[in-house]
Swiss-Prot record:
Keyword Lipid biosynthesis applies: no
Keyword Cell membrane attributed: yes
Parts forming coiled coils: none
Keyword entries, A-Z: Cell membrane, Membrane, Transmembrane, Transmembrane helix
Segments crossing the lipid bilayer: 6-26, 52-72, 96-116, 160-180, 198-218, 243-263, 268-288
Alphabetical list of Pfam families matching this protein: UPF0182 (PF03699)
Subcellular location: Cell membrane
Protein name stated in the entry: UPF0182 protein Tery_4385
HAMAP family cross-referenced by the UniProt entry: UPF0182
Membrane topology: Multi-pass membrane protein
Family: Belongs to the UPF0182 family.
Gene Ontology cellular-component terms listed: extracellular region; plasma membrane
Main location: membrane
Length: 919
């Protein structure tokens, strides 16, 4: 009977555990299916296997060690019972009761330790696959890789063991206390005796050994000290704290020896005296000695003493942020611009950005969203060769936002089967404006109509920034494709994305994982059905590579007629010796509070590289992780861990590389650090004599920090135009411009940073000074005031500083928007040069007013791109053939082929309609 009861209890416990773990197990199963579908199964299994290995290992070690200490303590006190529950009905069972309590608590502690250990899989793998850096720290002469890849594991193991031994000590003390082995009546020397004293002494020895190891590692932590003149080890750290940590490590080891030797003594006098002496020496070495050194030796001679350590900080901070290769040039800022100079730089002038992304986004939404469930989330900036001209453009994908579907139409079928994708994009050149103040659109409408030599062959967007719901494709019901007059167009997904849901077992798993019974009972599923999840591209790439940090502003590129998302991925660390974390840098909070930088640089990040670009297909969801920095040791470590994840730099297609751009947020981070770290002289740095800052500008009516901006221009001493990202600098507490920085994005020059410094003795107007001159111009201020009084909202766009050869000019677009409207129109363009400030209807007129030169826009052949042109009879024959193929696929229940044929049929109908209208 007892055996039967035990079996029932055991089965019940197993079922309870299985039920509690079932959701986790099912989720792991669906995750495995997803990783297999996206061809990254090896990454999933590598991570999972190491997590399981560490979890099991930690649980077993913790449980065995803690239970062993409990067992030893109980055996050494087997002559006594636990002094609890006396005088109660449970008194006869108190030993069993306490044993169960200890078993449960030890199990819970072991589970907690295992759960806390399993996330360390990345730390272990980086340790095992570490790639050395090319340099060493200046204090211990250790490779930088030691601090980034090895020391974190050593310190983690030390903390892990300390917690383990300390927990064993506490459990043992509790057992002895409950057994009444600590008697207050004894002399303190005899508080512990015999085998109990031996047990406690050995555990104390283990604790003190680990404390000694901790002091040994603290020596290295001095390289990350933030309490001195600069980040990293200073004079006091090297000459006082370093000695103190050495001394305390030795003292802790001696204390461990004392604890072990006390085993042969019948009292605890030695360990007690040892602990007292240790505490006294700790205060002497760790507190008083460094304080004395700092106050009486360093402070009176701080610059002299700290100078070499300031130099270390400058050198290593520059290395960590990639600022050691900034090429510095002089920029004379001459006032020699004339019409001939502008003609010689037509590539720059014709690509001056007149459209600020903020009012342009409002314009896109008003003119091109078409339906309430479509949304333009952001405006991206890129460049294309259009009809032979290198053009900078702005573009945005039209995404599906299901939450904007009318509430009554928000059904399970519509959410997961019908409204599955966005459609198409809008593109305009940065510098062209129609007579009504609206942008000239190169690509527009639904289906996409192109006026240039760029075609959108696959406009459907299944994966994007707003695709936050899971969907099903390959169902027996059609998906909504796009709206058109009279009726909507429908389609069937024919791409490679999605996880097959072609069995009852898979439907059951996803129904349980997603808590959706409809997956089980819906009659729309077929043998070709697939589920698409992790469709948000930022979430999608993070699922594959959580060890990278991703830029929060993906952008689209039209490559071979397909919409591709490009995301910048960063490798970061907070363990680069002497490198100052971003959050500590001069006025860093100003940029950390703007945009996405705080997310990228969260924590104490003091090393960053943009080593990877990720491309995600908007239709299929396929991901490519391209290596763009082969010299990054952090990335090369991950490449050893996950060799199948990354695509080599040499294998990046040319048409993909043509759309890589220097990341805006990384540029901000580097520019922020350069505000202080352009100073290479330790004395200048100590005195903070030459601090810079980001300039300010006016947007609408508000002052704000100036944002870096992309520009196609010919850099000084360069032969041709290229796509660059630039930002001016001004001195702290002054408004004049002192320098400007450029980051190159094209070809072999990608990633190069250039700094152009103005002559110290020359006044070069900064952006805020130009804004003030605009405000002080009577004609301009009068016109702006007049518009405001007539009920229009005046929007002053970004002020752009445009370097041309060795001169500068300033451009600011002016937009008008009705107070109750959301459609901004570009009405004026302000150009400032030297002492002149002019505002006219167009950039061309403003330049002509100042320089006597008209800017001619590059000729663009306006041709609406549609499917291949055919004569009417050929089209009709093609339509009949496509219709026959559609019907044949429908009769065979081949819904994938049906979707392809029907889409082709509808495209041919549209082409026939346009050709008949044009005739």
């Amino acid at each position: 009977m007892k055996i039967r009861n035990y079996i029932i209890i055991a089965i019940s416990v197993i079922l309870l555990v299985v039920f509690s773990l079932s959701r986790t197990l099912v989720h792991l199963l669906t995750e495995a299916w997803w990783f297999n579908t996206v061809d990254f199964a090896n990454i999933f299994w590598t991570r999972l296997n190491w997590q399981i290995f560490l979890w099991v290992g930690a649980f077993v070690i913790y449980f065995l060690f803690l239970w062993s200490n409990y067992w030893i303590a109980e055996k050494l006190t087997s002559d006594r019972s636990f002094n609890i529950l006396l005088g109660t009905e449970l008194a006869p069972y108190r030993n069993i009761f306490v044993k169960i309590i200890f078993l449960v608590n030890i199990t819970l502690i072991s589970l907690s330790a295992a759960t806390a250990t399993s996330p360390a899989w990345e730390t272990f793998l980086k340790f095992l696959n570490a790639v050395d850096f090319p340099n060493q720290d200046p204090i211990y002469q250790r490779n930088i890789g030691f601090y980034i890849f090895r020391l974190p594991l050593y310190e983690g193991i030390k903390e892990w063991l300390f917690t383990l031994v300390f927990a064993g000590l506490i459990i043992s003390i509790i057992v002895y206390a409950l057994k009444g082995k600590f008697t207050a009546g004894r002399q303190w020397q005899n508080f512990l005796t015999g085998s109990i004293k031996t047990h406690i002494s050995l555990l104390l020895a283990g604790v003190t050994i680990l404390i000694a190891v901790g002091f040994w590692f603290e020596r290295y932590e001095l390289l990350f000290d933030s309490n001195g003149v600069v980040f990293g080890a200073g004079y006091t750290d090297v000459h006082a704290k370093l000695f103190a940590y050495w001394a305390m490590a030795i003292v802790a080891l001696l204390l461990a020896v004392v604890c072990v030797l006390s085993v042969w003594k019948n009292n605890i006098i030695w360990p007690t005296y040892g602990i007292v002496i240790y505490i006294v020496l700790l205060g002497l070495f760790n507190v008083l000695y460094p304080w004395f050194q700092q106050k009486f030796i360093v402070n009176p001679n701080e610059l002299q003493k700290e100078k070499p350590y300031i130099a270390n900080n400058i050198k290593f901070t520059r290395e960590a942020y990639g600022l050691d290769n900034v090429e510095t040039k002089s920029f004379p800022a001459k006032f020699e611009l004339d019409s001939q100079t502008l003609k010689n730089n037509q590539g720059t002038v014709r690509n001056i950005t007149l459209w600020d992304y903020r009012p342009l986004l409002s314009t896109y939404r008003q003119l091109q969203e078409m339906r309430l469930y479509y949304q333009f989330n952001d405006v991206d900036i890129d460049r294309y060769t259009i009809d032979g001209n290198y053009r900078q453009v702005m573009l945005s994908p039209r995404e599906m936002v299901y939450s904007q579907v009318p509430r009554k139409a928000q059904t399970w079928v519509n959410k997961h089967l019908k409204y599955t994708h966005g459609y198409g994009l809008v593109m305009n050149p940065v510098n062209e404006v129609k007579a009504d103040g609206l942008p000239v659109l190169f690509i527009k409408d639904i289906p996409p109509v192109s006026q240039v030599n760029l075609q959108v062959k696959e406009p459907a967007i299944y994966y994007g920034e707003k695709t936050d719901t899971h969907i099903f494709t390959g169902m027996s019901t059609e998906e909504f494709d796009y709206p058109r007059s009279g009726e909507n167009a429908f389609t069937f997904y024919s791409g490679t994305g999605g996880v097959p849901v072609n069995s009852l077992w898979r439907k059951l798993a996803y129904a349980y994982d997603l808590s959706s019974i409809n997956i089980l009972i819906s009659g729309y599923f077929t043998d070709n059905s697939k589920i698409h999840y992790y469709r948000n591209i930022k979430e999608r790439v993070n699922q594959v590579a959580p060890f990278l940090r991703f830029d929060n502003d993906p952008y689209i590129a039209l490559i071979d007629g397909k919409i591709q998302w490009i995301l910048d991925a960063y490798t970061v660390s907070d363990r680069y010796p002497y490198s100052e974390p971003l959050y500590l840098s001069n006025n860093a909070r100003a940029i950390l509070n703007r945009g996405n930088i705080e997310r990228i640089a969260r924590g104490n990040v003091n090393y960053i590289r943009n080593s990877v670009k990720v491309m995600v297909d908007a239709y299929n969801g396929t991901m490519k992780f391209f290596v763009v920095d082969e010299n990054d040791p952090v990335l090369n470590t991950y490449r050893k861990i996950f060799p199948q994840l990354f695509t080599e730099k040499s294998a990046i297609p040319t048409n993909v590389k043509a759309h890589f751009r220097y990341p805006l947020d990384l540029f901000k981070i580097k520019a922020q650090m350069y505000l202080s770290y352009h100073m290479s002289n330790p004395q200048l740095f100590y005195n903070q004599e030459d601090l810079w800052r980001f300039p300010t500008e006016v947007y609408e009516d508000n002052k704000q920090l100036m944002e870096p901006y992309y520009l196609i221009m010919r850099l000084p001493e360069k032969k041709g135009e290229e796509f660059v990202l630039i930002l001016p600098f001004t001195p702290v507490n002054k408004d004049n411009m002192i320098a400007w920085m450029a980051a190159e994005s094209d070809g072999d020059n990608y990633g190069k940073l250039l700094l152009y410094e103005f002559p110290k003795q020359k006044l070069v107007y900064g952006p805020s000074q130009i804004e003030a001159r605009i405000d002080q111009n009577p004609k301009i201020s009068q016109q702006l005031t007049l518009w405001s009084q007539k009920g229009s909202k005046v929007i002053r766009g970004d002020l752009l500083v445009i370097p041309i050869e060795e001169s500068l000019m300033y451009i600011e677009p002016i937009y008008l928007r009705a107070e109750q409207g959301e459609l901004p129109e570009l009405k004026r363009v302000i150009v400032a040069y030297d002492k002149e400030v002019v505002m006219t209807e167009t950039l061309s007129k403003s330049l002509e007013t100042i320089f006597g030169m008209e800017v001619k826009q590059p000729e663009v052949k306006v041709t609406e791109k549609t499917p291949e042109t055919k004569n009417i009879s050929e089209l009709i024959n093609s339509i009949v053939e496509a219709y026959s193929q559609t019907e044949a696929a429908r009769r065979k229940d081949n819904w994938v082929e049906y979707g392809k044929s029907k889409q082709k049929f509808e495209q041919l109908l549209q082409q026939l309609k346009k050709q008949t209208e044009s005739n």
